[in-house]
A protein has these predicted regions:
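Histidine-acidic metal/acid-base catalytic patches
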Residues: 1-4, 16-19, 88-91, 96-98, ...
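N-terminal pre-domain/capping segments
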Residues: 1-94
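Active-site-proximal loop/turn and secondary-structure-junction residues that shape catalytic pockets
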Residues: 10-12, 35-39, 57-61, 104-108, ...
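Conserved beta-strand positions in the central sheet of alpha/beta enzyme cores
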Residues: 30-34, 54, 101, 153, ...
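Short amphipathic alpha-helical segments
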Residues: 44-45, 166, 209-210
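Short, hinge-like loop/turn segments at secondary-structure boundaries
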Residues: 49-50, 71-74, 118-119, 171-172, ...
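A short acidic, helix-capping loop that chelates divalent metal ions and anchors anionic groups
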Residues: 63-71, 161-165, 236-238
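Active-site acidic/histidine proton-transfer and metal-coordination neighborhood
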Residues: 74-195, 205
Length: 283
């Protein structure tokens, strides 16, 4: 059976290690480290994290926060993003994790507080240029990942109506099924063994914004899905709400994947244990 992780992403007001301890002390076996508050000396915690967790996207948080963007043209953000991913590949090896996942790139550089909200109008790269930058960095990072037996996973972005209206174009990469599939063909052309981490909640909001069929999109993407992020929402905002036994994504769920991460916010360990139970009943 696929592994089931719980994300620390919803615990905004404490650091990831405290969230890890809380979950582990309350019957949660596997934890995905994501977000949270800044803390010093992540390396000293690596031994206690061994065999119990994996790292996702922007973690450990930097003292001066930024948005991880592997398609950025900004020299400072580019360097910070590349180094964060590079370090996380090495950290993943040290904690015996087989995977490291991160978001697809952006055509703009949003501020951390803008994530999930309306971005302020900024200089925007062409889709072609942003994809080329993203791809070049993936080629370099994949070499390091392969050397350390880590498989990289790209998570689909979420586009809401506010940002589409503001920019009059989609400022994010990999939000629609066609774009995701076409980009993964390029990865295959360059022989990059990189998988898709499908965030079903992101797909739901993007479907409503961009007007594509949600169930068909999920079905079409099945062939490249390696793992899932699970939560639910109203289709307008990526709110990380609880899913239920009747949630939309069960219909075309790919059951044989490497792992599922429950990325639900504002719940306690009892809520997570119930969500694990629902997920297991569907597998």
């Amino acid at each position: 059976m696929s592994l089931i992780y719980i994300s620390t992403g919803g615990y905004f007001d404490q650091n990831g290690i405290k969230s890890f301890d809380y979950l582990k002390n309350n019957k949660i076996k596997l934890v995905e480290l994501s977000g949270g508050k800044y803390f010093k000396n992540f390396k000293k915690y690596l031994p206690k994290l061994k065999d119990n967790c994996q790292i996702h996207n922007y973690f450990p948080p930097s003292k001066n926060s930024f948005v991880l963007n592997l398609a950025s043209k900004d020299p400072i953000i580019s360097k910070k993003s590349f180094n964060l991913v590079k370090n996380n590949i090495l950290y993943s090896k040290k904690i015996n994790s087989k995977y490291y996942s991160f978001h697809a790139g952006f055509r703009v550089d949003p501020k951390p507080k803008e994530l999930g909200k309306k971005f302020k109008i900024k200089k925007i790269l062409s889709k072609t240029e942003a994809e080329e930058i993203f791809l070049k960095r993936l080629i370099k990072l994949n070499k390091l990942a392969k050397k350390n037996n880590i498989k990289l996973l790209i998570e689909n972005n979420v586009i809401n109506k506010k940002n589409l209206k503001s920019f009059q174009t989609n400022p994010l990469l990999l939000t629609t099924p066609n774009e995701i599939l076409n980009f993964f063909k390029k990865l295959q052309y360059y022989k990059l063994d990189i998988g898709l981490l499908l965030d079903v909640a992101h797909l739901k909001v993007s479907s409503k914004t961009m007007g594509f069929n949600l169930q068909k999109a999920h079905k079409d993407l099945n062939k490249i899905i390696t793992a899932y992020h699970l939560s639910d929402n109203d289709g307008l905002t990526d709110s990380n709400k609880k899913f239920s036994i009747n949630s939309w994504f069960w219909k075309n769920l790919k059951k044989k994947v490497k792992f599922f991460t429950i990325e639900v916010y504002k719940t306690d360990y009892v809520g997570y244990l119930n969500l694990i139970k629902i997920l297991k009943s569907k597998l």
